[in-house]
Regions:
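C-terminal alpha-helix plus adjacent terminal tail
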Residues: 1-13, 62, 80, 185-190, ...
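Charged catalytic carboxylate motif
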Residues: 32, 36, 104, 211, ...
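Glycine- (often His-adjacent) and acidic-residue-rich active-site loop
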Residues: 57-108, 158
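Crotonase-fold acyl-CoA enzyme core
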Residues: 110-225
């Protein structure tokens, strides 16, 4: 599909980049943008060449979530969800529009979380609240600036999160922290977000884009087969008891898929490509925290 100027979708080889592009509104998501986001993620999902999907925001800010200015229109049916999607016209219940919007974004969030063949990265600067924060909960990696602003303000608007703010968040930061963030609706910094487990790594604002690009390039250097299988286990084994989860790892052995002969030789000889990859990972990820 054709994407509007509010959502920029770029494909550079195996790397997709989705940019929220309403900086004058902190990149909040209109109904039409949510439809486009769904289609953009779907495009990456079914692209056999896609290996990395990056989410970022224009104008030094990530995403402030829903465009709440549209909420009264949704409730009064002046803004039909059908105008932005292929779903049928809402039923008699005026709240149906909002229900369909939330359902669509829940599907989008689940699709991001379940991208087994594609590694997802959120690059966060500025505002990351509401639905923007919920998008990061679905991603494999989150890079953020120390001064980025995080929060779940829905309760102060008489709303409840619908895209994983209550559900996924508990798995990321625990039940008590999730209650604190959702029920009190206070704002916290990127540094706090890292301490609490929302963020993998903090980077300075000027380094966010190059560090994100370097991480994407590092991911591309890994075995696609091994990444796919590892993501599958990491995604689904965590939802079942450990005894059951162990079964997910049974087929994953050195004989289960294509072997990287050079990689095995490097491991044996402590030299070559494998050692180079480990040094590169350490240089990028472990040795340069701020």
């Amino acid at each position: 599909m054709q994407f509007s100027d509010d959502l920029l979708v770029e494909k550079n080889g195996p790397i997709y980049t989705i940019t929220f592009n309403r900086p004058e509104k902190h990149n909040c998501l209109s109904v039409s943008m949510q439809k486009e986001l769904h289609e953009a993620v779907r495009a990456a999902r079914f692209d056999e060449d896609a290996r990395v999907l990056i989410f970022r925001g224009a104008g030094n800010t990530f995403c402030a979530g829903d465009d709440i200015v549209e909420f009264p229109q949704l409730a009064s049916r002046k803004l039909s969800y059908d105008s932005a999607t292929a779903l049928p016209e809402p039923a008699d219940n005026p709240s149906t529009n909002g229900f369909l919007v939330t359902s669509m974004f829940q599907e989008t969030a689940a699709m991001i979380e379940n991208l087994i063949d594609v590694v997802t990265i959120a690059a966060v600067d500025g505002v990351c609240m509401g639905g923007g924060l919920e998008i990061t909960l679905c991603c494999d990696f989150v890079l953020a600036t120390p001064t980025s602003r995080w929060g779940m303000p829905e309760i102060d608007y008489g709303l409840t999160p619908g895209w994983g703010g209550c559900t996924r968040m508990q798995k990321v930061v625990g039940r008590r922290r999730a209650r604190e963030i959702n029920l009190l609706a206070y704002e916290f910094t990127g540094r706090q977000a890292e301490e609490w487990g929302f963020v993998n790594r903090l980077v300075e604002p000027g380094d966010l884009e190059p560090e994100t690009a370097e991480l994407a390039d590092l991911i591309l250097s890994k075995s696609r087969f091994a990444l796919r299988r590892s993501k599958y286990v990491l995604r689904y084994a965590g939802d079942v008891p450990i005894g059951t989860a162990a079964a997910f790892e049974l087929p994953i052995d050195p004989g289960a898929g294509p072997r990287d002969v050079d990689g095995f030789a490097a491991f044996t000889n402590k030299a070559g490509s494998l050692m180079d990859l480990r040094k590169r990972s350490s240089a990028l990820w472990a040795d340069q925290r701020i």
